[in-house]
C-alpha cells in the first residue's frame, strides 16, 4: 500500500455523497479508458507502465552517466523547457536543503537551468558565471528545434568549445532526445555526445520517470531507484484498485470534477513546505496543458502558506467563490525546532514554549483549512509521511494518473497541447523565419503598421 493518504473532510459540505458516487463511476470509466488504451491520445500512454517496465540496466546506465558528471563537474546545466525540466527540478528542489555547507557543496553537483525562458540578462549572467567553472550540460529536447532550449544550447555549446576545445567536450554534453531523428539527435551523433532516449509514446509533461527527469536527479545525488520504487508502488495500486475500492486517483479526479460542475473553476495547490515550490510548478503544467482546451478545464494555481496567507489569503477567504484547494501535508519534518521560554515574554510567545515549530505550522494549516471551508472554499488534503525519493515517486505518479483520468472525465485529450503553437507561429513571423512571411504581414497590419 502506498504512503499517500487523501481526506475529503473539508469537501463534504460542498459535494454530497450521491453526487460523489456518480463522479466516482465516471472516474472508473475513465480509469478503464487509460488502462485499455481506448481514449484520445492513446499513442502517448507509455508513461503508464514506465515504473514497472524500466529495466535495472537502464537505471544503471543513467547512474553511470551521473557519476561521470560528478567526477569532473561542479555544475550541470539542464537545458529544457516545460516537461523537459520541470519534473527533474521538482524532485531536486524538494530534496535539496535550502542552505548548504562548503562540505556538502563539494560532495554534490549543483544543478543550474537554462532554456526555460528567453531572458537575456539571465543567460548572459549564466554564461559569465560558468566561464571559470567546471561544468557539463544535459540538453533535453525530442526535436532539438524548440526555440528556447535550442538557443540556450547553442550559447552553451559555443562556451564549451571555447573553454575545452571541440574534441574534448564529448563527455561534458549529454543529449536526451529522440531515438533516431531530429536536429538534436543528428548533432549528438556528429559530436559523439552520449545520448538517452525520450520514448515516442511519452509526452514531455509525463516524462519525469524517463531519462528526461532521471539523469538530472541522479546527477544531483539522489536515488533514482527509490524514486522509481515509489512510482512503481503507486502504479501497481492505481492499476489494480477499482474506484469503488478506494482508488486514490479516481477519488481525486472525481472530487475535482464534481466541484468543477458546481462552479469551482480554479484549483489551488497549497503547500506549507517551501521545498514543494517546483512540485507545484510541475503540477500546474501537467494539469494546465492536459485539461485546458476546447473551452474547458480547471485553472491550476498555487500558493505557499503561510507566506501567501499574507498576500493571497484575503482573496481566498473573501473573494469570488470559484475556488477549491488541494493541500499537500507532510506529517514529519526531517528536522525540527523547539521554542523556548523567555523571562520577560515581551513578544507574548511564552504560551508556545516547549512546542515544536512543526506543531505551530500544523496548527496554522488546520486553522486555515477550517477558515477557508467556512468561507466557501472546499479543501482536499493529501498527506505524505515525509519528503524523500520514494514518497515523491508516489506523489508524481499519482498526479500523472489522476490527470489522465480527470482529462477523460472532462472529455478532452489529456496528451496534446495544440494551443501552444499559436504564440510560436506569431514569434517566428515577427523574427522573420522563412515560411512565415504572410503571417508577419497579417500581424503588422493588425498592429497598424503597413
Curated annotation (Swiss-Prot):
Gene Ontology annotations for the cellular component aspect, listed alphabetically: cytosol
Coiled coil, from the record: none
Annotated signal sequence range: none
Main location: cytoplasm
Catalytic activity: alpha-D-glucose 6-phosphate = beta-D-fructose 6-phosphate
GO molecular function: carbohydrate derivative binding; glucose-6-phosphate isomerase activity; monosaccharide binding
Protein name per UniProt: Glucose-6-phosphate isomerase
Organism from which the protein derives: Leptospira biflexa serovar Patoc (strain Patoc 1 / ATCC 23582 / Paris)
Lineage: Bacteria, Pseudomonadati, Spirochaetota, Spirochaetia, Leptospirales
